[in-house]
């Protein structure tokens, strides 16, 4: 869904995305091997987190539409990661299910920022296809609470930005080595 929103984010200085790691079959195997009673107790190593993210990126790219808009979005996504404008981290110890979008305004703005929370994932389905429900919170206390909680989780998260780029460029249809004749 990035291709659908990036034009609206062009003037944004910095974008931080924090993702949770879903409980897939590989995760269940790790839980069984480690005798962890719940996912809440599970803590991925940095390597396991990056490997899981690699699979998620490959799956997202496989399911993406084969259009010029998606391809432009992927180029922009990689460009923003390489420039430092976009940073993606994965939280290794619990699946983050909450959908929270925090906007921080410039210093001279009327207020510090806003929070949007609700059911929309940052995917094509969540942004375009599904019927979703979201709420904008304008209260400064809500903004501060969300910002503090996000920063708390961010500091313990694993940077997976380069893993995104590496996976897209080496293990998906976006790779230069993938040709119609290969």
Where are these regions (language model features)?
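PLD/PLD-like phosphodiesterase catalytic module centered on the HKD motif
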Residues: 1-182
């Amino acid at each position: 869904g990035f291709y659908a929103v990036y034009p609206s984010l062009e003037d944004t200085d910095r974008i931080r995305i924090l993702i949770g790691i879903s409980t897939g079959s590989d995760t269940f195997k790790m839980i069984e091997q480690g005798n962890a009673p719940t996912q809440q107790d599970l803590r991925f190593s940095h390597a396991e987190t990056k490997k899981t993210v690699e699979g998620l990126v490959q799956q997202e790219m496989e399911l993406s539409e084969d259009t010029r808009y998606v391809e432009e979005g992927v180029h922009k996504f990689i460009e923003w990661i390489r420039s430092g404008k976009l940073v993606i981290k994965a939280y290794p110890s619990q699946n983050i299910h909450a959908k929270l979008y925090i906007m921080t305004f410039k210093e001279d703005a009327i207020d510090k920022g806003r929070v949007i929370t609700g059911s929309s994932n940052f995917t094509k389905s969540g942004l375009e296809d599904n019927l979703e429900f979201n709420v904008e919170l304008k209260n400064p206390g809500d903004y501060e609470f969300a910002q503090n909680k996000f920063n708390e989780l961010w500091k313990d998260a694993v940077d997976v930005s380069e893993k995104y780029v590496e996976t897209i460029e080496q293990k998906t249809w976006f790779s230069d080595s993938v040709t119609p004749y290969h």
